[in-house]
Design a protein with these regions (language model features):
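Compositionally biased, low-complexity flexible segments
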Residues: 2-5
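Membrane-embedded alpha-helical bundles that constitute the cytochrome b-like, heme-associated redox core
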Residues: 7-202
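N-terminal cofactor/phosphate-binding cores enriched in small/glycine residues
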Residues: 37, 41, 45-50, 77, ...
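Conserved helix-loop functional segments at active or binding sites
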Residues: 51, 292, 391
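Membrane-interface helix-loop-helix modules in multi-pass inner-membrane proteins
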Residues: 80-91, 98-132, 136-145, 277-281, ...
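Primarily the internal scaffold of c-type cytochrome electron-transfer domains
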Residues: 135, 167-178, 191-224, 240-275, ...
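Soluble catalytic regions of membrane-associated enzymes that act on cell-envelope
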Residues: 227, 231, 235-238, 244
Length: 529
C-alpha cells in the first residue's frame, strides 16, 4: 500500500532479526559465572600456594583451615557447574551462525576447555553414588587437567573476547591483586606453623605410662573415641577392616582369653604387692592401647568384660596414629598422637558426616600423611611391640629378655644383615611388611598397583601369627583363618647342613662340605649334623 514500508524484491532472502549473542537474561547468568569463577580463582591460588610451599620445603602446611577452604572450593565448583554449562549451551546456540568464524571457533575451544575443567573436578571429587574413581593413574591425569586447563581457559577467553566488546582489563587486574594479597597473606601466616611429624613425646608424660615405654605427643591422655573408631575407617577401607577382624591384632586385648587370664593375674599381684596397678602397665602399651591411653587401665574397678574398650584390641588408629619410634628397645617405646581429622569426623549428623567423607575422598593427601607415615614401612615400627623385656618394676627381680622378633629378624639372612645373608636368600627382605603384609587384591580407597596389573592393599591379617587365638576367641571363621596361616608357613623353615660327623660325636670323622660330593649315610648308624 501507498506510504507503507518497501517490500523486498521477489526472490530475495528475508533479513533476520538481530539476536545479541549475550542478551539481558544471559548477561545476568554470565555475571554469576564470572563471580563464582573469580572466587574460585582466589581460593585456588591459596590452595596451590600451600601445595607449592609443601613441595619446596618438604614440610606439611595443610591443616583444619586449609581443609575448610578446600571445602569452599568444592562448594563453589558445585555452584558453578550448572550455570557454566547452561550459559555455554545458550551462548553457543545464539552465536553459532555468526559471520566471525574465528571468534566462533575460539568459543568452541573455550567451552570445551571449560567442560574439561568441570569434568576433571567431578572426577576428583568422587561423589558417592554418582562417580567414584579409585584408579590412581586416572586421578593423577584428572588432577593435572584440573590444574593446567584453567590457564588455557583464561587464554582462550581473552582471544574470544578480542572479537567482541572491549575487555575491562582494570577489573581483571584488581581481582588478580586481591587474589595475590589474600593468598599471599594466608601463606605467610601458615608458613609459620608447619605440621610436625616424627617427634618424640615429652618425658613428662612418662609418669602416666611407665613401665611401658610409650608416650603421647602431648604427655596427656587420648580420648577412647579417637582410638576406637574402626567403623569410621571401614567406611572407605572395608577390605582392610575385614582382614584385620580375623587377625591376632584384633584379639590383642581383654578379648583374648589367655591374655585376659594373664593380665588379670598381673593386675591382681601388682595391686597386692605395690598398692597400685602401675607395674601392669608394662602389658598395656602394646596390648591395650585404647584402655591404656584413655587413662582407664589404672582403674582397679575397670570392667574387663563389659567395658567396650576392653574388646577393642589393636585398632586402626592405635597403629596408624603412632608418629615416632623413640628407640629400638621395644616394650612399646613409641610416641602416639591424637590425629588431626578432617572437619566433621565425629559428627552425628548424617549430612555433615557425608561432607567429611567427601572431603577425604576429594583431598586424601593430608589424610594419608596423617595415618600412613614412612615409619609404618620400617621394621623398627613393628619392633616397637615385637621386642620385649621384663623390667624389674614388673617382676621385682631383674631385667629379663622376653620374646624378640625384631633382633632375630635382623640377625637372620632374610634381612640381609645376618651372617647367612651371603648365600640365602637370593634377595633380602628389608622390612617385615614384605612377607607379613603381602598385597591382596582390593578396590578399597588407597589400593594401588603393586604389581602393575591389579589394584591391591597390604594384607592386615598378618599371616603366621598364633593360630590358636581365633579359635579361643570364638571367631566363627577360625578354621579358614588357621588354614591361611598354615598356607603362609608352608615351606618357610629351612635347615642348612654344612657337614656330618660319623659316630655322632664331636670328634668323629668330618665330611664337609656336603656339595658337590654328597656322602651316603648308612641306616642305623649315628651321625652328628
Amino acid at each position: 500500500p501507498a506510504g507503507g514500508p518497501a517490500m523486498p524484491p521477489a526472490g530475495s532472502p528475508a533479513k533476520r532479526r538481530y539476536v545479541p549473542a549475550v542478551g539481558p537474561r544471559l548477561a545476568k547468568l554470565l555475571f554469576a559465572v564470572f563471580g563464582l569463577f573469580a572466587l574460585l580463582v582466589v581460593d585456588s591460588v591459596y590452595l596451590l600456594g600451600v601445595r607449592g610451599l609443601e613441595a619446596a620445603t618438604g614440610q606439611t602446611y595443610q591443616n583444619w583451615f586449609y581443609l575448610i577452604l578446600f571445602l569452599l572450593h568444592l562448594v563453589l565448583g558445585a555452584l558453578l557447574l550448572l550455570p557454566a554449562v547452561g550459559f555455554g549451551c545458550a551462548h553457543w546456540w545464539r552465536a553459532r551462525s555468526r559471520p566471525n568464524r574465528r571468534a566462533v571457533a575460539v568459543g568452541y575451544a573455550l567451552f570445551t576447555a571449560v567442560l574439561l575443567l568441570l569434568a576433571s573436578g567431578v572426577v576428583l571429587t568422587r561423589l558417592e553414588g554418582i562417580l567414584v574413581v579409585k584408579d590412581p593413574a586416572v586421578r593423577a591425569i584428572a588432577w593435572w587437567v584440573h590444574v593446567l586447563v584453567p590457564v588455557a581457559v583464561a587464554w582462550l577467553f581473552v582471544l574470544h573476547r578480542l572479537a567482541g566488546k572491549r575487555i575491562r582489563w582494570r577489573v581483571g587486574r584488581r581481582w588478580a591483586v586481591v587474589a595475590a594479597l589474600f593468598a599471599g597473606g594466608l601463606l605467610v601466616v601458615q608458613a609459620q606453623d608447619p605440621r610436625r611429624w616424627n617427634m618424640s613425646g615429652p618425658a613428662s608424660g612418662e609418669r602416666y605410662f611407665l613401665p611401658s615405654l610409650a608416650r603421647t605427643s602431648t604427655g596427656g591422655f587420648i580420648p577412647a573415641r579417637v582410638l576406637d573408631n574402626n567403623a569410621y575407617c571401614a567406611e572407605c577401607h572395608a577390605d582392610t577392616h575385614k582382614r584385620w577382624q580375623k587377625s591376632a591384632h584384633r584379639f590383642s586385648s581383654f578379648n583374648n582369653p589367655p591374655y585376659l587370664f594373664s593380665v588379670r593375674e598381673t593386675r591382681k599381684v601388682a595391686l597386692e604387692r605395690d598398692g597400685d596397678l602401675q607395674a601392669a602397665r608394662f602389658c598395656a602399651g602394646c596390648h591395650d592401647p585404647v584402655v591404656f591411653f584413655s587413662g582407664r587401665f589404672d582403674d582397679p574397678k575397670f570392667d574387663d568384660v563389659n567395658d567396650p574398650t576392653a574388646k577393642a584390641g589393636l585398632t586402626c588408629t592405635a597403629c596408624h596414629a603412632i608418629t615416632h619410634v623413640n628407640s629400638p628397645r621395644g616394650n612399646s617405646d613409641y610416641t602416639i598422637e591424637e590425629p588431626q581429622h578432617y572437619p566433621f569426623a565425629f559428627s552425628g549428623n548424617k549430612a555433615l558426616a557425608w561432607v567429611n567423607r567427601q572431603l577425604i575422598k576429594a583431598k586424601p593427601e593430608f589424610h594419608k600423611k596423617t595415618f600412613l607415615k614412612p615409619l609404618h614401612r620400617t621394621p623398627e615400627f613393628c619392633g616397637a611391640c615385637h621386642k620385649v623385656h621384663l623390667p624389674q618394676q614388673l617382676n621385682g627381680y631383674k631385667w629379663l629378655r622376653g620374646q624378640n622378633h625384631y633382633d632375630s629378624f635382623l640377625l637372620s639372612g632374610v634381612s640381609g644383615h645376618g651372617v647367612a645373608a651371603f648365600y640365602y636368600p637370593e634377595k633380602a627382605e628389608a622390612n617385615c611388611n614384605g612377607c607379613h603384609m603381602k598385597p591382596v587384591p582390593s578396590t578399597d580407597f588407597g589400593a594401588k598397583y603393586h604389581d602393575g596389573k591389579t589394584l591391591a592393599i597390604r594384607d592386615h591379617l598378618f599371616p603366621s601369627a598364633n593360630t590358636a587365638i581365633a579359635k579361643l576367641a570364638g571367631e566363627p571363621e577360625w578354621p579358614e583363618i588357621v588354614k591361611e596361616h598354615e598356607r603362609f608357613n608352608d615351606g618357610v623353615v629351612r635347615v642348612d647342613l654344612f657337614g656330618v660327623k660319623e659316630g655322632g660325636t664331636i670328634d668323629g670323622p668330618l665330611t664337609a662340605p656336603l656339595r658337590p660330593r654328597v656322602p651316603t649315610l648308612v641306616p642305623g648308624r649315628s651321625y652328628l649334623l
